[in-house]
């Protein structure tokens, strides 16, 4: 069921109203406490600016890091408030706590169009427990609820799910709406052929996604460290490459399932090997049937790249989740960069390219190709769960569209 969106609320609905907006401001900081990537803050600007323009009092709620229900000064949202203020070109007041006297005083002092950022909601253990009393206090600051934190939508927490019991309407922000349109659309009503590229080191973390995608896709391309579990399941020697011994049967089952459904399941034909796990390791390219002892695979090989590019050539929708190799090491980033370049070219030809969160986003940004993709998801775990066909609690809690 489609969810009600912020677009359905006009200035008459919002002017002078206190609006609680759950955002995803979980940004990386360096050792000096400075933000190194403000993508998530910028992603929330359309929703925040729309509310400011409609005369709302904008109360932002966010988490940062994993403080485990304790106040941790290193995880305060102070640098986020400063950066948001720069991006909005107006002051952003930050509260000392997300509930209590200081939060109430700062909210009560707001004029229409003002913005207040509540302190890290995870300083309270009740947030992750979805405690009703805590949710009611948080909701008590506002009259309307907007969830724009897709990256936290797979969590049933007080600020994502609990508050919706006390605030009406409860609607999706523009970022949330865009994520749902692209990710659900890709799975439910894709332009075909639909291909998924799944990478990463472990089969175990992508089991649900692989099973769901084999059900829905025309082609599934697998890269990253997880390929060696598939090779070993086929009886091949993999040297000292990463293998999940307890997932060998599952790998066989996934291959059999794809075959039975007529889905093209592609594994790399060659790999780039290293003699140890290091950026300056000695390397060689080998066919997957001839991996020598003592070597480990850290990237897909040049032939595999060509085969993957050919397979993607006629696709109208491509979902990518997980790198092809250890792209943090320049020597073993070639496969990942080649896939990023291929998807950028396909986008230019009208293919819908969706980068499904996590490391693939970092890889695309590192390659300087982020603006060439149709959609880059801001949620790692949330995008995986949505692709698996799971219901996201933070989405389910919102009002249905009329």
Curated annotation (Swiss-Prot):
Positions of disulphide bridges: none
A Gene Ontology biological process term: gluconeogenesis
A Pfam family it matches: PGK
E.C. designation(s): 2.7.2.3
GO cellular component: cytosol
Pathway in which this enzyme or protein is active: Carbohydrate degradation; glycolysis; pyruvate from D-glyceraldehyde 3-phosphate: step 2/5
Keywords assigned by UniProt, alphabetized: ATP-binding, Cytoplasm, Glycolysis, Kinase, Nucleotide-binding, Transferase
Chain positions recorded as substrate binding sites: 24-26, 40, 63-66, 122, 155
Chain positions recorded as ATP binding sites: 206, 297, 328, 357-360
EC class name: transferase
Cell location: Cytoplasm
GO MF term list: ADP binding; ATP binding; phosphoglycerate kinase activity
CDD domains: Phosphoglycerate_kinase (cd00318)
Stretches that traverse the bilayer: none
Protein family according to the UniProt entry: Belongs to the phosphoglycerate kinase family.
Protein name: Phosphoglycerate kinase
Native organism: Parasynechococcus marenigrum (strain WH8102)
Recorded name of the encoding gene: pgk
């Amino acid at each position: 069921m489609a969810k009600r969106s912020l677009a359905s609320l006009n200035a008459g609905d919002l002017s002078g109203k206190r609006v609680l907006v759950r955002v995803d401001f979980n940004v990386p900081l360096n050792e000096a406490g400075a933000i190194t990537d403000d993508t998530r803050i910028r992603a929330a600007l359309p929703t925040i600016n729309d509310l400011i323009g409609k005369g709302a009092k904008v109360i932002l709620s966010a988490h940062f890091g994993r403080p485990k229900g304790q106040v941790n000064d290193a995880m305060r949202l102070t640098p986020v408030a400063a950066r948001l203020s720069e991006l909005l070109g107006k002051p952003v007041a930050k509260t000392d706590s997300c509930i209590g006297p200081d939060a109430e005083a700062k909210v009560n002092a707001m004029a229409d169009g003002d913005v207040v950022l509540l302190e890290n909601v995870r300083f309270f253990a009740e947030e992750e427990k979805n405690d009703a009393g805590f949710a009611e206090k948080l909701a008590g600051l506002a009259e309307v609820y907007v969830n724009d934190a897709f990256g936290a939508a797979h969590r049933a927490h007080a600020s994502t799910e609990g508050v919706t019991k006390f605030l009406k309407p409860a609607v999706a922000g523009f970022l949330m709406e865009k994520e749902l349109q692209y990710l659900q659309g890709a799975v439910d009503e894709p332009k075909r052929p639909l291909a998924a590229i799944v990478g990463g080191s472990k089969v175990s973390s992508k089991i649900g996604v692989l099973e769901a995608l084999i059900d829905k896709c025309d082609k599934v391309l697998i890269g990253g460290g997880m390929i060696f579990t598939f090779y070993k399941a086929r009886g091949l020697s993999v040297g000292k490459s990463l293998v999940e011994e307890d997932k060998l049967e599952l790998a066989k089952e996934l291959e059999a399932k794809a075959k039975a459904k007529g889905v093209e399941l592609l594994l790399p034909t060659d790999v780039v090997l290293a003699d140890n796990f290091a950026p300056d390791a000695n390397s060689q390219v080998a066919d997957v049937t001839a991996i020598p002892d003592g070597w480990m695979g850290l990237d897909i090989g040049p032939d595999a790249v060509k085969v993957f590019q050919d397979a993607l050539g006629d696709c109208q929708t491509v979902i990518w989740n997980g790198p092809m190799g250890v792209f943090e090491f320049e020597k073993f980033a070639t496969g990942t960069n080649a896939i990023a370049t291929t998807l950028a070219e396909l986008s230019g030809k009208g293919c819908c390219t969706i980068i499904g969160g996590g490391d693939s986003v970092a890889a695309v940004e590192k390659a300087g190709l982020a603006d060439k993709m149709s959609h880059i998801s801001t949620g790692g775990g949330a995008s995986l769960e949505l692709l698996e066909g799971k219901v996201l609690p933070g989405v389910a809690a919102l009002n249905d569209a009329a």
